[in-house]
Curated annotation (Swiss-Prot):
<dbReference type="GO" id="GO:0030317">
    <property type="term" value="P:flagellated sperm motility"/>
</dbReference>
<dbReference type="GO" id="GO:0030382">
    <property type="term" value="P:sperm mitochondrion organization"/>
</dbReference>
<dbReference type="GO" id="GO:0005739">
    <property type="term" value="C:mitochondrion"/>
</dbReference>
<dbReference type="GO" id="GO:0043679">
    <property type="term" value="C:axon terminus"/>
</dbReference>
<dbReference type="GO" id="GO:0043209">
    <property type="term" value="C:myelin sheath"/>
</dbReference>
<keyword id="KW-0966">Cell projection</keyword>
<keyword id="KW-0770">Synapse</keyword>
<feature type="region of interest" description="Disordered">
    <location>
        <begin position="1"/>
        <end position="115"/>
    </location>
</feature>
<keyword id="KW-0175">Coiled coil</keyword>
<keyword id="KW-0968">Cytoplasmic vesicle</keyword>
<dbReference type="GO" id="GO:0001764">
    <property type="term" value="P:neuron migration"/>
</dbReference>
<dbReference type="GO" id="GO:0043204">
    <property type="term" value="C:perikaryon"/>
</dbReference>
<dbReference type="GO" id="GO:0005737">
    <property type="term" value="C:cytoplasm"/>
</dbReference>
<keyword id="KW-0744">Spermatogenesis</keyword>
<feature type="modified residue" description="Phosphoserine">
    <location>
        <position position="432"/>
    </location>
</feature>
<feature type="compositionally biased region" description="Low complexity">
    <location>
        <begin position="94"/>
        <end position="108"/>
    </location>
</feature>
<keyword id="KW-0963">Cytoplasm</keyword>
Amino acid sequence: MDHSLGWQGNSVPEDGTEAGIKHFLEDSSDDAELSKFVKDFPGSEPYHSAESKTRVARPQILEPRPQSPDLCDDDVEFRGSLWPQPSDSQQYFSAPAPLSPSSRPRSPWGKLDPYDSSEDDKEYVGFATLPNQVHRKSVKKGFDFTLMVAGESGLGKSTLVNSLFLTDLYRDRKLLGAEERIMQTVEITKHAVDIEEKGVRLRLTIVDTPGFGDAVNNTECWKPVAEYIDQQFEQYFRDESGLNRKNIQDNRVHCCLYFISPFGHGLRPLDVEFMKALHQRVNIVPILAKADTLTPPEVDRKKCKIREEIEHFGIKIYQFPDCDSDEDEDFKLQDQALKESIPFAVIGSNTVVEARGRRVRGRLYPWGIVEVENPGHCDFVKLRTMLVRTHMQDLKDVTRETHYENYRAQCIQSMTRLVVKERNRNKLTRESGTDFPIPAVPPGTDPETEKLIREKDEELRRMQEMLHKIQRQMKETH
């Protein structure tokens, strides 16, 4: 028996049977993939070779195993000791270690399986895909943005808007004559257009204010603008408070570009009154129009003067949010450059001219060419970056969280006061014992009118009490 089992301690030469088994393993898809994976894994060669030789040699045992009921037989013990002992490398590498998620081979069905990922299934929940879900839903729904432009005529408001969004919003506009301009009052006009860029849809609404500042007497010419902003807040408040709130259209004004004339030494009284009347209702971004009529030193002095007067009169223009601590340095430098550029000195042009072999949008003068998108000539690129690329969502957030919430709080407070007054009147009516309700005070009355109404209410109450006393006396006498 010892002689028959002596082959187990020696290496088995590679014969035809082993070659056939290897060929069979190579043809089998699952075993071939497993064999190749174990063979390629670092440090697994001794295990692979020993295991392969053992699997090949064991079927060649010809002598039957003794049928002894005693499991502690010496032959059994001797035969068990003749099995090859594991080497040092096999003691530390009894089985391939599990792969990390990053080094795990991807399944060939990974592209078709939405749950297949490089993360470990036991450690990966899936809520990291929430930003992608929000992104898909937002892109599918589209975005709304309402921009108001205000300022006197001739400052390039329409041209700048067309240059910002590369579209013609004033295709059907008619220029008024001199007599019509004299009789013209401040109007509110809306231009809506759908813009799509790389699959993202934007519904842009431009609110224009023709006739603003064109009259000789411009007293309270800003009132129609303020009333329009309040009307949009009121309409949104009604829709939000209604039963069906699925398809609420947001027409609130998110930003107001106020154009300041380059002629003069700062802000005019009309500019101050307009911005003070609207700075609690809308995000105001001051614009220094027609910057090509000023030299670079004049532009710098004009900007400093306007910033000083804005601070002096307590005007609250749109404030850029502070950068987060984890923002990169390039973004922080860009944000600082935008803050220092207020008011933005801009130039608008829809004409394409040729400059140094390039076709650019700009204005051609006898002494040279002014390029609209050249940062050295104007702040058009900075304004577009702020308005469209970096702070459009923040403008909408400030409108919703600050300006609209202020209007909403005022509406709720006024409604609460009216309800309290009505309850007090009903209580007094029940105490007086009359079925005739006391007329309510109309909203918006002055203090003198309210005082007069209260006096009349007291007089009516005394007369009712006298009438009840007379009725009781008449009943007692009868």
